[in-house]
C-alpha cells in the first residue's frame, strides 16, 4: 500500500490529520462525507450511536478506510472509547469485556487479557486507536465521572495495571491512549458539565496524579484533561503549553501522540469555544483534537488552524512535526489491519466471551459481613438501569429486577422507585420478610436511593446491600451488616448476580481502594 509522506501532502491534508471528529449515523452520512471529501480529514471517532451490530460496523469502517485513503493518501485513525465495563461503545456481537474492575478479579493478569480482547475485536472491525485506559487515580469518592473507571486509589497499582492493559492492546496492534493527563481522579466536577480544579502543589501532583503516566511514558498516545491545575497554569491542561509541552514533552520526554478530550465538553466550550479551543490546544502542544459532535465546530476548527498557519502562529515546521508523528503511529497499525481487517473474514472469539464473564464472576467482593441467603420470604429490590453520567453507555439488557423475576419466580423482586409511596409501602411490609437484599447503584449521585436504603437498614437488621458500581457506596450507608460489591451494572454483572444468588459462585474479589 502506497501512503503519502508529509512532503507530498497539501496544507488541507496536513490539517485534516489534526482533527478527530465524531458524527451521528450508523452509515457514511453527509457530515462525515463532507469532512473527508471536502476537508480531507484523516481520522474518525466512533460512539455507541454509530453501532448497530458488527456487520454494519465493519461495512461503515471499510467505507471510512476507503474514503480517507482516497482523499488524504493515508490510512485513518478510527478511534473509540472501548474502556470496557460502563464505558463500552460496542456491545453487540463482540466481547463484552470488563473495565478496571479487572483489578478486583482474582484472575492472574486479567487486565492484560482485557486489553487484548478489546483490541482483537477492534482491529477486526478496522479500529486502530483505543481511547483507554484511564490512568486516573480513584482517590475521591465524590468524583462523578471517574470512580470505577480507575483501577485503584493507589497510583502504583494504577500504573502497573494500566501498563498491562496497554501491553495487551498492543498484541493486536491497537494503539492505547492513556487518559486524562495529568490526572482526573481527585475532583468533584464532571468536565462534561463544568471546569474542575485540582488545587495541589507540584510535588503532590507528580507523586500521585502524574505517577501512572510517568510509569507508562512509552504509551502510544496520551489524552489531556480539561482540568485546571493552578500549580502549573491559569488555563486547563488541554490548553496549557506549560503542561503539554514543557512538562509532558520536555520534562517527561514523551514522544507519542497527545490527544485532547472532546472540545465540545463544557469545560472548554463554555469558556473558550470549541473551535478556538482546538487552535489553543494545538498551539499548546496537542497533536489531535477530539471534536465529537458538531460539523460547524469541526469545520471552524480547521479554518482557524489554516489561518494560524498562514499568519505564522502555527509554523509549518511545527505542523509537519505533528503530522509526521501521527503518520508514524498510523503506520505501526498497518500490518495488523492487513492481517485482521483488509479483505479478511470477520470472526470473533467465543473463548474471549467466556473469559470476560469469568473475570466479572471473580470480581464479586464481600466487603463486610456474611453472604446473602435467599429464603422463600426474601425481599429483593434493584435500582432502575440508567446511565448515571454522560460518559456511560446505555445497555439494552440492564434490568436486573426483570432478570431476577424470571430466574426466581417465587421471589418477591421489585424495581426501585424513587417515590415516597414506594418507600412507605416497603417500610410498612419489612416485618413480613426474613431478610432483604438491596442493590445499590452509584449512591454519590442518587440522594433518594441513599435515603431509602438507610431507612431499610435502620428498620431491618437482616439486610444485605450489594453495590453494582464499586465499593464507594459503602460510605453512604449507616448500620451496614452485610455488604458486597460488583463494579459495573452490565449484562455480565447481572449474570454474576444470578449465579451468586443461586449459590453457584462465592465472592473472590478484592478491594482496590481503602474505605
What is the predicted role of each segment?
Residues 1-40, 275, 279-515:
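Preference for extracellular/luminal or secreted protein segments
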Residues 8-10, 21-22, 28, 49-72, ...:
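Second-shell residues forming the walls of enzyme active-site clefts
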Residues 33-47, 116-129:
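Catalytic domains of carbohydrate-active enzymes, especially glycoside hydrolases
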Residues 35-54, 141-142, 215-234, 432-445:
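Short acidic, glycine-rich surface-loop motifs adjacent to enzyme active sites
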Amino acid at each position: 500500500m502506497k501512503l503519502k509522506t508529509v512532503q507530498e501532502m497539501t496544507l488541507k491534508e496536513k490539517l485534516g490529520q489534526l482533527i478527530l471528529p465524531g458524527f451521528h449515523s450508523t452509515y457514511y452520512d453527509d457530515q462525515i462525507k463532507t469532512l473527508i471529501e471536502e476537508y480531507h480529514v484523516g481520522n474518525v471517532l466512533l460512539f455507541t450511536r454509530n453501532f448497530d451490530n458488527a456487520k454494519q460496523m465493519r461495512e461503515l469502517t471499510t467505507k471510512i478506510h476507503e474514503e480517507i485513503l482516497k482523499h488524504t493518501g493515508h490510512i485513518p485513525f478510527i478511534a473509540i472509547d472501548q474502556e470496557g465495563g460502563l464505558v463500552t461503545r460496542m456491545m453487540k456481537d463482540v466481547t463484552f469485556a470488563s473495565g478496571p474492575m479487572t483489578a478486583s478479579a482474582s484472575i492472574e493478569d486479567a487486565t492484560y487479557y482485557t486489553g487484548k480482547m478489546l483490541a482483537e475485536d477492534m482491529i477486526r472491525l478496522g479500529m486502530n486507536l483505543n481511547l483507554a485506559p484511564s490512568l486516573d487515580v480513584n482517590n475521591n469518592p465524590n468524583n462523578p465521572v471517574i470512580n470505577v473507571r480507575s483501577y485503584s486509589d493507589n497510583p502504583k497499582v494504577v500504573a502497573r495495571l494500566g501498563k498491562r492493559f496497554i501491553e495487551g492492546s498492543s498484541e493486536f496492534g491497537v494503539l492505547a491512549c492513556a487518559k486524562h493527563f495529568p490526572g482526573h481522579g481527585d475532583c468533584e466536577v464532571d468536565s462534561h458539565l463544568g471546569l474542575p480544579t485540582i488545587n495541589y502543589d507540584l510535588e503532590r501532583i507528580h507523586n500521585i496524579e502524574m505517577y501512572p503516566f510517568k510509569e507508562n511514558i512509552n504509551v502510544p498516545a496520551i489524552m489531556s484533561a480539561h482540568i485546571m491545575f493552578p500549580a502549573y497554569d491559569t488555563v486547563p491542561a488541554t490548553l496549557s503549553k506549560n503542561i503539554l509541552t514543557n512538562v509532558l514533552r520536555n520534562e517527561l520526554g514523551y514522544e507519542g501522540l497527545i490527544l485532547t478530550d472532546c472540545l465540545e465538553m463544557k469545560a472548554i466550550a463554555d469558556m473558550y469555544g470549541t473551535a478556538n479551543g482546538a487552535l489553543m490546544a494545538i498551539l499548546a502542544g496537542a497533536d489531535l483534537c477530539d471534536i465529537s459532535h458538531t460539523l460547524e465546530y469541526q469545520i471552524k476548527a480547521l479554518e482557524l488552524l489554516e489561518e494560524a498557519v498562514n499568519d505564522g502562529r502555527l509554523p509549518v515546521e511545527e505542523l509537519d512535526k505533528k503530522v509526521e508523528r501521527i503518520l508514524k503511529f498510523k503506520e505501526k497499525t498497518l500490518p495488523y489491519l492487513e492481517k485482521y481487517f483488509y479483505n479478511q473474514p470477520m470472526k470473533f472469539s467465543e473463548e474471549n466471551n467466556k473469559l470476560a464473564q469469568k473475570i466479572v464472576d471473580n470480581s464479586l467482593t464481600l466487603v463486610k459481613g456474611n453472604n446473602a441467603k435467599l429464603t422463600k420470604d426474601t425481599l429483593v429490590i434493584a435500582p432502575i438501569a440508567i446511565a448515571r453520567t454522560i460518559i456511560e453507555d446505555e445497555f439494552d439488557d440492564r434490568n436486573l429486577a426483570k432478570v431476577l423475576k424470571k430466574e426466581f419466580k417465587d421471589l418477591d423482586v421489585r424495581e426501585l422507585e424513587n417515590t415516597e409511596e414506594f418507600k412507605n409501602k416497603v417500610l410498612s411490609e419489612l416485618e413480613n420478610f426474613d431478610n432483604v437484599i438491596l442493590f445499590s447503584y452509584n449512591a454519590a449521585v442518587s440522594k433518594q436511593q441513599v435515603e431509602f436504603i438507610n431507612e431499610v437498614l435502620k428498620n431491618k437488621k437482616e439486610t444485605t446491600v450489594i453495590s453494582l458500581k464499586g465499593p464507594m457506596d459503602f460510605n453512604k450507608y449507616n448500620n451496614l451488616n452485610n455488604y458486597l460489591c460488583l463494579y459495573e451494572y452490565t449484562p455480565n454483572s447481572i449474570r454474576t448476580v444470578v449465579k451468586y444468588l443461586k449459590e453457584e459462585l462465592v465472592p473472590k474479589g478484592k478491594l482496590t481502594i481503602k474505605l
